[in-house]
Structure formats: C-alpha cells, structure tokens
Amino acid sequence: MQEVDQKVRSSIMINYSYLALGDSYTIGEQVLPEDNFPYQTVALLNKKEPDSYHFTAPQIIAQTGWTTDELDAAINAAAISKQYDIVSLLIGVNNQYRGRPVNNFKIEFEYLLQRAIQFSGNKPTHVFVLSIPDWGVTPFAEGRDRKQVADEIDAYNSVCQKSAAAFKTHFINITTSQREDGNKQEFLAPDGLHPSGKEYEKWAIELADAIIKAL
C-alpha cells in the first residue's frame, strides 16, 4: 500500500524550473556552487514540500563583474528557448561601481526585467527582483566613501523596487539585513567583499518563502 501511495504522489508531483539572472551575487563568487543563493533556494523548496513539487537545478546566467548590458549580451548568447516557472533578477552593483548614471541603469534594468517576465511565460508574479547589496559596509571598502556608496546603492535599489512594482513583479529587500552583517567575517567570502554561504542562506530563505506564496 505504501508503494502505491508513493506512485500516486510521484504521478501528481510537479517539476519546476528556475532561471537566475545576475552577477557575482548570483553565481556566488568564492563560494561553492551549492552555497550560492539560487542553489540554496532550490534546496529549501525541495525540503519544504517534497511530496508536492520538485525544483530541478537552477539555470544560472551570471558572472562576476557583469553590468546590465553585459548580462543582456550573455542572455542573447545563451539563446534561451524555453520558459521557466521562476525567474530571479539581481543586477546593478557593477553599474554603480563603474559610476554609471542611474537614469541609464533604469532603462537597461527595465529591459532586463521585461525579458525576465518573458522567460517566465509572461507571468510577472513568478519573477523576483532582489535588491542590490551594499558593498560599502564590507572590509573591501576600507578607505572609500562608505556613505556615498550607500547613497548610490539606495538610488539604484529605488529604481529596482519601483520598476518591480510597475511591472507587477516581486521585490525582495535583502540589503537591509546584509548591511547589518556585511562586515562580519562569518557572512563574508575570503575576499572580504562577496557574501559567504551563510549570508546567501538568508536570501534563500526569503526567496523560497516568496516563491511558495506565488506558486
């Protein structure tokens, strides 16, 4: 009887796919692949409802140093031909780091967001924008104008939040919590700039909870 029940559960289990778009914060610079936030999110989701659905390994299009236009070019090169059940977008820190104007970022970010919506099968409620972390609180920023960095990150995140609302997608603020822990060793990768798996776990918990509500 137990074997029959397992077969029934398997027949109704839904397989979900997840596309993660971004930069170093998505690929997980200096952490193991399973410790980046997309992989941790999938692991959490598969633990929460193991008999109801299963997320396959996330497809990640992200690389350290990418700006919005570089991510867009990489998406073109990937020639994505399928749709995904969930799409996340976290991009912009390198635009800020290179001193690019916020107005230009808004144009390129909203274009990427529209592409993300298309990849979700035109389901904006299945698209999740994550806020840009503040690298100014990390040891890497020693000797730099931390307030200026914070102000610029806030301006970029304002664009992300308003654009997410305008296109009816989700916005997840991970920056506030990251600013609290961003100078603590256990929340940092060895380079003193990028997050550790422990920091990514916090993001994954928030994202997984939001995804469950959206499904």
Question: Can you annotate each of these PLM segments?
Answer:
Residues 2-64, 74-81:
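Serine-esterase "nucleophile elbow" of acetyl-processing enzymes
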